[in-house]
Regions:
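Nucleotide-activated donor-binding/catalytic signature segment of Leloir-type glycosyltransferases, i.e.
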Residues: 1-25
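Hydrophobic "lid"/C-terminal helical patch
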Residues: 4, 97-101, 131, 135
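Short acidic active-site motifs
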Residues: 22-23, 53, 92, 96
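Short alpha-helical segment that forms part of, or immediately flanks, the ligand-binding pocket
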Residues: 25, 47-60, 75-76
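Short hydrophobic beta-strand element within catalytic cores of glycosyltransferases
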Residues: 33-36, 56-68
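A charged, aromatic-enriched C-terminal amphipathic alpha-helix characteristic of glycosyltransferases
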Residues: 88-91, 105, 109-138
């Protein structure tokens, strides 16, 4: 909140206290653009941090903006699922926001055409099936 008040953007933002997990899909569906905060790590630093927030965001079909791109797994997943943009520059983020803002002005909502099959691979149901296959295979050894 402090960072938002340092710039003239606070009036465009909603801040939530604790939100129960059961309410998260509703919050995401009421949002216009979903924000995923990340960063580019040093070449010897950690890579591939993908939180459940990412997968929940991809599932609702709203534009997903990741700032700053991790230039790794997160960026590749967003690109491969067509769920938004992992911005490497402020200009990229600006163009993404402007595009979806103009769509919102014209239509009253935002949407992005994700690759639903690619997103579905990350669902809890699909992951549970994958784990069951692994455990079944291990059990047969």
């Amino acid at each position: 909140m402090q960072a938002a008040t340092a710039y003239p953007v606070a009036r465009y933002m909603d801040f939530f206290d604790y939100v129960p997990a059961s309410e998260i899909p509703g919050v995401l569906n009421r949002s216009s653009i979903l924000l995923q905060l990340a960063n580019t790590f040093a070449s010897d630093g950690p890579k591939g941090f993908m939180t459940t927030k990412l997968f929940e965001s991809m599932a609702v079909g709203k534009p997903l903006l990741c700032v700053k791109s991790d230039e790794s797994c997160l960026e590749a997943t967003i690109r491969n699922t067509h769920s938004g943009l992992a911005a490497r520059t402020a200009e990229e983020a600006f163009r993404f926001i402007l595009h979806h803002y103009q769509f919102w002005q014209d239509n009253g909502y935002t949407h992005i055409n994700t690759d639903k099959e690619a997103v579905e691979r990350f669902s809890r149901k699909k992951q549970a099936v994958q784990f069951m296959r692994i455990f079944t295979r291990l059990n047969s050894k």
